[in-house]
């Protein structure tokens, strides 16, 4: 989740000026193109790991315990954490950045907290499925999920563009609850399968891993120039959009699995640094997005080079994000709002 800070800081300097705050002085295709590959797999990797961890919890705890944990760790941060940090951004923006309160809609409230909506929806699906079902799932359900995540995803985009024409808050809710869910559930599903088939991870040959890596890189090489608008690899018709979606699923899914495979075999669970990074992740993820926007505006000086501006923005975003975490974890009401576990008392 932490690599998102690098991506959002780079998005401020994007030549496409599509981010919430786009610098009028600093535009760098070279920098944006350097960071862009991580954008193609980071959320897919996140949901793959989330599916694995969800099934691990369900295998050890009852469904009631699992659901209560999801309400505390996912729904509460969505309702309170997102509301809090994005409200502060709105206040800051209304004073300094010409934000209008009339535009403080559902998207402004949730913004980058959309992944929490996906997690709570996926947790709801887990609650509906029998416990341990992923240990018994065959090929057909896997194909069905893959088809929904590819053909279904493209169909939803096509129907909305051609028939539904959803706009405003309705479009935002549609994207957050349905479109993103269909987009990322195949990876959550794959992570859930991995939990019950961990024995197969030990039998994967080095040759298979190399082939998967090569396949993922080839797919990435097709997506990369198209996403950066360097060369139109795929057409804008429905067949081109579907092909692009399939290639992206191959690229992001392969890289997500390879990352999972690597860290699965690196046993560092006892490291204090790793525990700290895990415990702070939700706070860093929720606060860095508005911080990038505010700091991007505050630091935007034409006297700085693109590299200086980016590095300053990146470093200060990390510093203030972790300062926020240190403050949040020390205040009970803020710990609750961000879904953190209670602090353990220190014994002398």
Label the model's feature ranges.
Residues 1-348:
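Alpha-helical transmembrane segments and their immediate juxtamembrane cytosolic regions
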